[in-house]
Amino acid sequence: MKERSTELVEGFRHSVPYINAHRGKTFVIMLGGEAIAHENFTNIINDIGLLHSLGIRLVVVYGARPQIEQNLADHHYEPVYHKHTRVTDNKTLELVKQSAGLLQLDITARLSMNLNNTPLQGANINVVSGNFIIAQPLGVDDGVDYCHSGKIRRIDEHAINRQLDNGAIVLIGPVAVSVTGESFNLAFEDVATQLAIKLQAEKLIGFCSTQGVQDKDGKILSEVFLNQAPELIKELEVKGDYYSGTVCFLRSAIKACRRGVRRSHLLSYQADGSLLQELFSRDGIGTQIVMESAEQIRRANINDIGGILELIRPLEQQGILVRRSREQLEREIDKFIIIERDNLTIACAALYPYPEEKIGEMACLAVNPKYRSSLRGEVLLNRIAEHAKQLGLEKLFVLTTRSIHWFQERGFEPAELSMLPIQKQVLYNYQRRSKILMLNLEPQPGFT
């Protein structure tokens, strides 16, 4: 008898909303030369093929920096840089074209073949390259001529979209031609960024040697806001990581995010399956750079009742929360705030004000177990406290049987039953014997 894999079933169920959400969207994928040279590149290619089979419009932009460096070394030619940008003279240009051309052929071959020995065996993938980008020279800076190092003059987004509409993967490298027929060496990060902006891509995806951006303790930051990214870049540059994949990608993500690309993702090219885990799971595996959080804290409405019930039922069964019926929730839904992540309610809390006594009760604080290691409970507490102050309340109380220390660590102090509003005193459950804790609220401007 075959064994059932519940993990596979659950994983597939959780991925379905993302499959539907991503279908028909445009993703720009940045593949640096380091990623292409790594042994895991075959798996990345297979996963790119899988994305294509799911109806995602893909533009793959590749770089060749380490391959160019090796080619220069093999020809005993010393690379020249000015302000961290390669000076591409005639000899260097020939070697750049050689390296980039070989990679284009290799990537095209890998994407075009039938992907034997993979779940996509027999799939037909068309890969298209062309003169979609017109370049121009960087020119002269501080007396240094960049020669054939260039930048983008314009992008033919209509031609690219035609190919994407026809079901092709568009492959673009770091060499482009000018209106005069000259070839120029471009920074592939700039190419990917400008393409994502011009194509109004849903996502810009990059790869580096680590699984995203790390904090000072070495932990992966699952989310970085746009206003945080510049400081992270400075910290990495101080360490001498000017050319690291992380720094280059962060620079690109900032530009893309400011120009309308909703999310940028940074993943490890060393970890098998990182691309799929990032795109088809709620929490991902790398770092995403966003204008605003993927999570939303807001007032609950009648459509949120199902999600709240699903969140609080386990806690009610354990006796941690007082049981609430659907009918009660419907009557009191305006008292609740929730934290929502990708249409899933992951945390909730309620405020029951007693205006005459200038006091309020914080109740039904619940956080999904997968998200309890973060500060979401504290975020809800702060939001409830702010709302209470806006209502002119001076105190906030809770009744709790299990979270006494958590509230005390946040300023709550033991209180007597007689300190509660009369209505609450009458309803106090002597069988539960909940502890009463109270917090003095700082006065909100406008209230005395």
UniProtKB/Swiss-Prot annotation:
GO terms for cellular component: cytoplasm. Pathway: Amino-acid biosynthesis; L-arginine biosynthesis; N(2)-acetyl-L-ornithine from L-glutamate: step 1/4. PROSITE patterns: GNAT. The keyword Acetylation does not apply. Disulfide bonds: none annotated. InterPro entries: AceGlu_kinase-like_sf, Acyl_CoA_acyltransferase, Asp/Glu/Uridylate_kinase, GNAT_dom, NAGS_kin, NH2A_AcTrfase. Its main location: cytoplasm. Keywords: Acyltransferase, Amino-acid biosynthesis, Arginine biosynthesis, Cytoplasm, Transferase. Its EC number is 2.3.1.1. Pfam families: AA_kinase, Acetyltransf_1. Homohexamer. This is Amino-acid acetyltransferase. It comes from Photorhabdus laumondii subsp. laumondii (strain DSM 15139 / CIP 105565 / TT01) (Photorhabdus luminescens subsp. laumondii). The gene is argA.
